[in-house]
Amino acid sequence: MAKPYDPKDFYYRKAKKEGLRARSAFKIDEILRRHRLLRKGQAVLDLGAAPGGFLQILADEVGETGVAVGVDLEPVRRLGKPWVKTAIVDLLSPGALDQIRTLHAGPFQLVTSDMAPKTIGVKITDEARSLELVRMALDVAEKTLAPGGAFVAKVFMGGEFPVLKKELQARFDEVHVIRPEAVRESSYEVYVLGKGLRRAAARAAPTANATPTPTSTSTSTPTSTSTPTSTSTSTPAPTLTQTQTQTPKKPARRAPAKASTAGKAKAKTGASRRTR
């Protein structure tokens, strides 16, 4: 039988003792240790970052030569590390990706999400809302991850979970389902991990870098340049030449008019053929 909910259990007290903002720090720490997802100097994006439990661990993993970006609907208190950048971002807004790219223009090697819905106690509803958040996070990951990158997200286990797993398997080389030790016994949350984002699934990772923008612009330039080329090809000069070639024929047609009656008959026959 599961233990009753205790908001101040072992991991809560341990987090407070170690200066961590949330018990979730132990969850991502375990996942990183087991799967080696980050190195110094890399870039990581944390969705639903407040209060900063994940972000504290992720920032230490990438170090001062890397970059850790955290976004949430609520403000994230500063960590005091210059390579950590945070912002208030609504992932449902059309400009969400642009906001993220102002914090880091390049692709990320890891995207994490500890987002959870406001539960109402109805399991099927809570599960459905959790899946919506994971899919929203996955959409952001596909548009910001570099090929070969990884994705970690919290989700509530339920009847539709196998469908989500198949969606991840279609995009990543490896998919793992992890239940860290710091998850409460009474909780049915797990973390899904996708490793090795396939190049075909990385829909907008190249555009996450600002560099390709001028490339696409310059590509369109030759297209406009080709317009004069096609114009010069279809220049009416040859048509005018044909018209000028036909002009001298008019006197030649008039010449038989001074000839015999038979010549006039031939001219009339030719005229009737042209009329047809």
Curated annotation (Swiss-Prot):
Keyword Ribosomal protein annotated: no
The keyword S-adenosyl-L-methionine is assigned to this record: yes
Keywords: Cytoplasm, Methyltransferase, rRNA processing, S-adenosyl-L-methionine, Transferase
Catalytic reaction equation(s): uridine(2552) in 23S rRNA + S-adenosyl-L-methionine = 2'-O-methyluridine(2552) in 23S rRNA + S-adenosyl-L-homocysteine + H(+)
Segments of skewed composition (Basic residues): 265-276
SUPFAM superfamilies: S-adenosyl-L-methionine-dependent methyltransferases
GO MF terms, alphabetically ordered: rRNA (uridine-2'-O-)-methyltransferase activity
Low complexity composition-biased segments: 203-249
EC number: 2.1.1.166
Region Disordered: start-end pairs: 203-276
Gene3D superfamilies, alphabetized: Vaccinia Virus protein VP39
Location in the cell: Cytoplasm
Function field: Specifically methylates the uridine in position 2552 of 23S rRNA at the 2'-O position of the ribose in the fully assembled 50S ribosomal subunit.
Family per similarity comment: Belongs to the class I-like SAM-binding methyltransferase superfamily. RNA methyltransferase RlmE family.
UniProt protein name: Ribosomal RNA large subunit methyltransferase E
Organism: Anaeromyxobacter sp. (strain Fw109-5)
Taxonomic lineage: Bacteria, Pseudomonadati, Myxococcota, Myxococcia, Myxococcales
